[in-house]
Structure formats: structure tokens, C-alpha cells
Amino acid sequence: MKQKIVLATGNKGKVREMSDVLADFGFEVVAQTDLDIESPEETGLTFVENALLKARYAAKVSGLPAIADDSGLVVEALNGAPGLYSARYAGIDGETADAENRRKLLRDLADVPVGKRQAKFVSCIVMLRHETDPSPIIAEGECIGEIIFAEKGENGFGYDSLFFTPEKGCTFAELETVEKKKISHRARALAVLKSKLGA
């Protein structure tokens, strides 16, 4: 019988991604929303701290092992912004948040020339065996690129249509989902997690 593990998200895409990796290690992933667990306030100052807060809260409320990720876009010319606030950069929630976040990013970078628009997507995954686990498994991944001047591509979400990856010569939004999953920050963090679980 597989050991249940709570994923601190309601995002079905993340549940599928994590399930694919963790199934090989005897885990059955359950979304926290399926257990009526709310998300805690993200008060950390780093991606690691926020992922740890979310995993610890899910483990505490469920009594099960837990896993969480925190991720975002880090733009050098903006001193790391949007960073921890990537999902709410424009200060709004809801269906229009992604579009508003992209508009704000373009406004904030309006005077920044080519060659100074370096950015990276960062993902940090934390896994706890129980609420008071003193040695959580931490896996980080990143994808380096730059922010272009106008949106390009129809796939993806968030900042994908503005994030140009030199590795593929296009934006994340121009990649097919299968291709993006191979090189994304989350895919790289999951690869690190997999290697740590297999160790």
C-alpha cells in the first residue's frame, strides 16, 4: 500500500507533476484542497522559507508527510522582483492576475535595454516526513533567460510569454508543454528531489 503525502496546493497540474515523480518512491499524492486544508500565510523571506511554511502547515493539519513548492520569477534589473510576489506582483488576484502581472513587469522594465533584462525562474521544493521533521529534503531548480519587450506565444501561463530561454531560442509560451517540462525550473527541482529520494 502506498504512503499518502499531502501536496500543499490545489493546483491540479502540480499534483500530476509531483505524482509522476513520487509514485516511483511509494507515495500517493493528495492535494491539500482535497483534505479541506487552507494555505497558510506566506511570511517567509525566501522561496525555501515559504515552501517550508506550506509543507509544515500541511503536515501539521493532516498528520501526514507533506511536500510543497514555492517558485517565482527573479529579474536582476528589478533587484530580484517580482520574486516571492510573482503571483501577486500587480497587487490583484483572480483570473486577470497573470495578464496584469505581465503588464506591470513590462512597465517596470520599459527603460531597461537588451542585455540588461536577465531573469530566472526559481523553484524550491520541500518535503517533510512529519510536522517536526528536523531535516527536510530541499530541492531547488532554476531556468535562466531574459525578459523580452512584448508577449510571444500562446502556451503556458504566468510570465511564460515574456520569458525567453536561450537554451531553446524561444519563450516558454512558444514551447509545447512536453518540451517546457523538460527544462523548466520545476522540472529541474523535481529531478534534484528524485535524486535525493533515491540516495
Swiss-Prot record:
Q: Which InterPro entries match?
A: dITP/XTP_pyrophosphatase, ITPase-like_fam, RdgB/HAM1
Q: What is its EC number?
A: 3.6.1.66
Catalytic activity entry: XTP + H2O = XMP + diphosphate + H(+); dITP + H2O = dIMP + diphosphate + H(+); ITP + H2O = IMP + diphosphate + H(+)
Pfam families linked to this entry? Ham1p_like
Ligand binding (substrate): 9-14, 71, 157-160, 180, 185-186
Known role: Pyrophosphatase that catalyzes the hydrolysis of nucleoside triphosphates to their monophosphate derivatives, with a high preference for the non-canonical purine nucleotides XTP (xanthosine triphosphate), dITP (deoxyinosine triphosphate) and ITP. Seems to function as a house-cleaning enzyme that removes non-canonical purine nucleotides from the nucleotide pool, thus preventing their incorporation into DNA/RNA and avoiding chromosomal lesions.
The identity of this protein, by name, is dITP/XTP pyrophosphatase
